[in-house]
Amino acid sequence: MSYVFDSSSIFHALKRRRVDVLADNYTVSLTRYELGNILWKEEVLHKRITSVELERLIGFLKRVLDKMKVLKIECCETEVLNIARSLEISFYDASYVFLAKKIRVPLITEDLKLIQRAKPLVDTLTLNDIIGSF
């Protein structure tokens, strides 16, 4: 089965050393920037990693994303905006919901608010929900 992974679930897979579950699954093109921002915060704001670790992780994430099906949503901003409005979620989050709905696969996220809000449109799961199937 295929899935759409949001940035929270990809980061969680990285932390759990389970990036294997990401291969050949879907995400949106903005994920690269969301993950870069998460890692930047880990170094600059939280001081959990060094600058050398940050650069190494950015390179590793690039290789991970290269194994995923990263889709652009540039043609569908109006539909994404409508989802964001109707579910009262961010445009970023709505892009993942849009993709999951469009290709008819579950959305994998660690965001509890998104799990609840997206349920009317798509099936939502966490990484833990699917980890046993890999």
Model-assigned labels for residue ranges:
Residues 68-106, 110-113:
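Active-site neighborhoods of divalent-metal-dependent phosphate/nucleic-acid chemistry enzymes
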Residues 36-40, 62, 81-84, 97:
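Amphipathic alpha-helical segments within well-ordered protein domains
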Residues 32-36, 77, 114-115:
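Alpha-helix N-cap/helix-start and coil->helix boundary motif
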Residues 14-48, 52-56, 70-71:
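PIN/NYN-family metal-dependent endoribonuclease catalytic core
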Residues 1-2, 27-28, 99-102, 106-134:
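Acidic, PIN/NYN-like endoribonuclease modules and their adjacent C-terminal/linker elements
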Residues 1-16, 68:
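Metal-dependent nucleic-acid phosphoesterase active-site entry motif
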Residues 49-62, 113-120:
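Membrane-interacting alpha-helical segments
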Residues 7-9, 35, 94, 112:
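Generic detector of well-ordered alpha-helical packing
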